[in-house]
């Protein structure tokens, strides 16, 4: 059975790259009727926090990425936080030492820095040269007496080529001579990433490791640990980096970098999932809109690209706009409510009347926005008593003929029997004939008078939302 995992470090919010890794693992597990595990790699004690952990888990849930085993949901392979598994790492580190695959290293940071500088001066790759590999018991005692706290290093075999058959990148090989003996347990007893990740993956039965390309260089070290402990090596798939449009590493200047930022800006979870799936994966067709169910059905690693994925904010905006326009109206109203509340257009405990109006407002304006946060700006014409007039609208309303027509329209507005859209549509349709002028001469100044703009929602929607009385008031304001 396929078993995959997402293992974030809780040192900050869930970033776009992490969200994509989680999504690809989730899709792969669901496609193959497998198990998706979420565990927390919190061995960076200084930077890890429960607050960040909470943010990451909430962001995953918001995206609709659920897990079968792991943090919060439990399972038979727990605990699922690395800081709660230290005894396990210690046990396997001791096994490696006893079997001659690892050793205690007493080198100080100063000594290691000196060694690094010397290698660089010779034009060689910095690596540990094995000074403590073959210490005598007396030398170890001497270092301990000096108060030195040892690390544990893995003994890297010389002259080997490690070959990885990566499911995305194909055959990749590494020479062990360029690696050097690496630390697996720090002097404070905390395991390093490369060691802990192997122990976790093995004890949790992980069959496939899908992760970012930046982890590729760690893979030979991890394979050496698998081999030394006699563990089965999982399949690896390293997903390409996400770059900005300028082909540099994704950063804040390319747009928001965390899932939380996009949520706050009014992006829909299904739009972000759709967009993230297309960052490095291709369906093999021209289609661009996919539900989670469709992604699960279509996803495969052989359609994941080796080349870097380009983060195109315009494309995300297009996808998000599509979902805003085409999702159930009631859902968009519910999701947009906080944005209307934060600017004071809707109260914190909305009345039925407020919600009825909001529903009409969202229906009238949603086709003009790409994020929910833009809705209040487009809806301001329905909530603000004083309109801000665009220059084009001012010019239109300065025309004497237009002003005369508007006076007549104001009188006619009193004749509308109610404020239902169909009634208003009928009223608007017969208005030009009743006034004896072309439709354009009625509708353009009327729109300008009611909204301060020359473009926007359908006129019948504008009057239905404002109500005939408010529409009349706005027209008469022009003459006061």
From Swiss-Prot:
Describe its function. Answer: Catalyzes the attachment of glutamate to tRNA(Glu) in a two-step reaction: glutamate is first activated by ATP to form Glu-AMP and then transferred to the acceptor end of tRNA(Glu).
The yes or no answer to whether the keyword Transcription regulation is present is no
Q: Where in the cell is it found?
A: Cytoplasm
Q: What is its EC number?
A: 6.1.1.17
> Which lineage?
Bacteria, Bacillati, Bacillota, Clostridia, Thermoanaerobacterales
Keywords, alphabetical:
Aminoacyl-tRNA synthetase, ATP-binding, Cytoplasm, Ligase, Nucleotide-binding, Protein biosynthesis
Q: Does the keyword ATP-binding apply?
A: yes
The entry sums up its family as follows: Belongs to the class-I aminoacyl-tRNA synthetase family. Glutamate--tRNA ligase type 1 subfamily.
Q: How does it assemble?
A: Monomer.
Q: What is the native source organism of this protein?
A: Carboxydothermus hydrogenoformans (strain ATCC BAA-161 / DSM 6008 / Z-2901)
Example of a GO cellular component annotation carried by this entry: cytosol
Q: Where is this motif: 'KMSKS' region?
A: 249-253
Q: Where does ATP bind?
A: 252
| Main location per the UniProt record | cytoplasm
Official protein name in the record: Glutamate--tRNA ligase
The reaction(s) catalysed by this protein are: tRNA(Glu) + L-glutamate + ATP = L-glutamyl-tRNA(Glu) + AMP + diphosphate
Gene Ontology terms for molecular function? ATP binding; glutamate-tRNA ligase activity; tRNA binding; zinc ion binding
Which top-rank group of organisms is this from? Answer: Bacteria
Name the enzyme group at the top EC level: ligase
């Amino acid at each position: 059975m396929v078993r995959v995992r997402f293992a974030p470090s809780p040192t900050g919010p869930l970033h776009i790259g992490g969200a994509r890794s989680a999504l690809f693992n989730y899709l792969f597990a669901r496609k193959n009727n497998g198990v998706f595990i979420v565990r927390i790699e919190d061995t960076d004690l200084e930077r890890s926090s429960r607050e960040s952990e909470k943010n990451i888990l909430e962001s995953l849930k918001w995206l609709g990425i659920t897990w079968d085993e792991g943090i919060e949901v439990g399972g038979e392979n727990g605990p699922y936080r690395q800081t709660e598994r230290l005894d396990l790492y210690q046990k396997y580190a001791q096994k490696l030492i006893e079997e001659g695959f690892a050793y205690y290293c007493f080198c100080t940071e100063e000594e290691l820095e000196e060694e690094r500088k010397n290698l660089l001066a010779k034009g060689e790759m910095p690596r540990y040269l094995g000074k403590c590999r073959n210490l005598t018991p007396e030398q170890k005692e001497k270092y301990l007496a000096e108060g030195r706290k040892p690390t544990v290093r893995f003994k890297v075999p010389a002259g080997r080529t490690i070959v990885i058959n990566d499911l995305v990148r194909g055959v990749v090989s590494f020479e062990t001579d360029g690696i050097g003996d690496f630390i697996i347990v720090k002097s404070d007893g905390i395991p390093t990433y490369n060691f802990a990740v192997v122990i976790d993956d093995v004890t949790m039965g992980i069959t496939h490791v899908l992760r970012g390309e930046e982890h590729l260089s760690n893979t030979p070290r991890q394979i050496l640990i698998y081999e030394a402990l006699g563990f089965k090596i999982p399949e690896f798939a390293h997903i390409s980096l996400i770059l900005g449009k300028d082909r540099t590493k994704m950063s804040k200047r390319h747009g928001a970098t965390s899932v939380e930022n996009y949520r706050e800006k009014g992006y829909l979870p299904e739009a972000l999932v759709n967009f993230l799936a297309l960052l490095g994966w291709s369906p093999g067709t021209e289609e661009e809109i996919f539900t989670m169910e469709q992604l699960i059905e279509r996803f495969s690693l052989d359609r994941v690209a080796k080349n870097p994925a380009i983060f195109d904010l315009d494309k995300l905006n297009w996808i998000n706009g599509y979902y805003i326009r085409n999702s159930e109206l009631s859902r968009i109203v519910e999701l947009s409510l906080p944005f209307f509340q934060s600017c004071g257009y809707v109260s914190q405990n909305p009345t039925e009347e407020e919600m009825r109006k909001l529903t009409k407002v969202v229906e009238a304006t949603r086709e003009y926005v790409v994020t929910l946060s833009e809705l209040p700006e487009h809806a301001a014409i329905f909530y603000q008593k004083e309109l801000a007039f665009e220059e084009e609208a001012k010019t239109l309303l300065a025309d004497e003929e237009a002003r005369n027509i508007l006076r007549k329209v104001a009188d006619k507005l009193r004749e509308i029997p109610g404020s239902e859209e169909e009634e208003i549509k009928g009223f608007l349709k017969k208005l030009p004939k009743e006034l004896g002028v072309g439709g354009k001469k009625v509708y353009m100044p009327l729109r300008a008078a009611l909204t301060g703009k020359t473009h926007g929602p359908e006129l019948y929607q504008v009057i239905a939302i404002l109500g005939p009385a408010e529409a009349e008031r706005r027209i008469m304001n022009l003459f006061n």
